[in-house]
Regions:
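Short, surface-exposed loop or secondary-structure junction motifs
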Residues: 3-199
């Protein structure tokens, strides 16, 4: 670790996008492979090495910058503390108590779709075709093969039907109609307005 200020980053900093990471490379597998001169598709450890060899942009907690990388770290922390795979822990300890039984970490390709998973489309204005994330050189739809979705883990890989997502939100929103799976204090902390920017 080049910058010793990394040791000052807390779980709360990660949750609030206040870690100070210099960039967010998770949607740039091919760039990471080229930059690090890898002979394989980048794995989590490669992303860690890339980010940790740079200085932080700002001291942890002093500013905010959206960070998928921070949420990847949170996924790893959950695995380390629980001793269980991230997806298994979240399904058993969060989603099932909320009444959600059909949410999953998604796949990268159309063929990976779960039975109730939506068909994705590329937004107008985005390049529809990009190089496949694994460096094959094959051009694919951005939403099917453009990114390594399972690698994202807690940083945006979850998929679920609108009904499942509504159940989850209802179980953590602090409203009385549905019993919350977290405490009122946790709801208040989670929803506290803490920044004047965009997140």
């Amino acid at each position: 670790i080049k910058d010793k200020n990394y040791y000052k980053i807390t779980v709360e900093h990660l949750l609030r996008h206040q870690g100070g990471f210099y960039r967010d490379p998770l949607f740039s597998s091919n760039d990471v492979r080229n930059q690090m001169q890898l002979d394989h598709t980048p794995v989590k450890e490669d992303f860690y090495k890339l980010v940790l060899r740079h200085n932080l942009r700002f001291m942890p907690g002093e500013s905010q910058r959206y960070s998928n990388f921070g949420y990847l770290l949170l996924s790893e922390i959950i695995e380390k503390v629980s001793g269980r795979p991230y997806e298994e822990f979240i399904c058993e300890e969060v989603l099932k108590p909320a009444g959600c039984y059909d949410m999953h970490i998604g796949g990268s390709y159309y063929s990976d779709r779960f039975p109730n998973e939506a068909r994705y489309y590329t937004h107008e204005g985005e390049g529809k075709f990009v190089e496949e994330f694994n460096g094959s050189g094959v051009m694919v739809e951005r939403c099917y093969g453009g990114n390594n979705i399972p690698l994202l883990s807690g940083a945006g890989a979850w998929c679920g039907s609108p009904a499942e997502i509504a159940r989850l939100v209802a179980s953590i929103n602090g409203r009385p109609e549905v019993e919350d799976i977290i405490s009122a204090d946790a709801v208040a902390q989670m929803t506290e307005y803490f920044d004047k920017e965009t997140y």
